[in-house]
């Protein structure tokens, strides 16, 4: 992907501004330092100066590391490296915990959502807290 972006000129300048690039942090890379390292690697592979959205792929409820991971995400946002922060597959309990431990809500929660699985509780919770729902 990075080579294609660079070859087409879409990795910098005015062309870059016309794209929305999202990347996700793998579960095994959660944690403060490992999230920062993984992000740097993603930028290198994408050959970009920033991403439009960086997302936690899964809340890892049995080995909760999302708090430290989120703190790294906030650092990246504050530095202009990731413009929007999101999560994937977070249920209301996960979102509450993240908010209680960091004081922040994600901008987006990407969840499986379709006519046969509407996840009304998750959607309502996100709406109440100003979190956009992105369906996959």
For each feature predicted by the language model, list its residue ranges:
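Extended hydrophobic secondary-structure segments that form protein cores and membrane-embedded regions
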Residues: 20-24, 55, 110
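An active-site-proximal structural segment forming one wall of the substrate-binding cleft
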Residues: 31, 35-50
């Amino acid at each position: 992907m990075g080579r294609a972006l660079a070859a087409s000129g879409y990795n910098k300048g005015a062309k870059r501004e016309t794209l929305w690039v999202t990347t996700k942090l793998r579960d095994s890379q959660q944690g403060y330092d490992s999230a920062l390292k993984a992000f740097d690697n993603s930028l290198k592979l994408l050959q970009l100066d920033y991403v439009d959205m960086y997302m936690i792929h899964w809340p890892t409820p049995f080995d909760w590391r999302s708090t430290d991971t989120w703190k790294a995400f906030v650092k990246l946002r504050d530095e202009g490296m990731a413009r929007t922060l999101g999560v994937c597959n977070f249920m209301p309990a996960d979102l509450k915990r993240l908010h209680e431990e960091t004081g922040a809500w994600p901008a987006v929660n990407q969840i499986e959502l379709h006519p046969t699985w509407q996840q009304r509780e998750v959607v309502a919770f996100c709406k109440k807290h100003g979190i956009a729902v992105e369906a996959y």
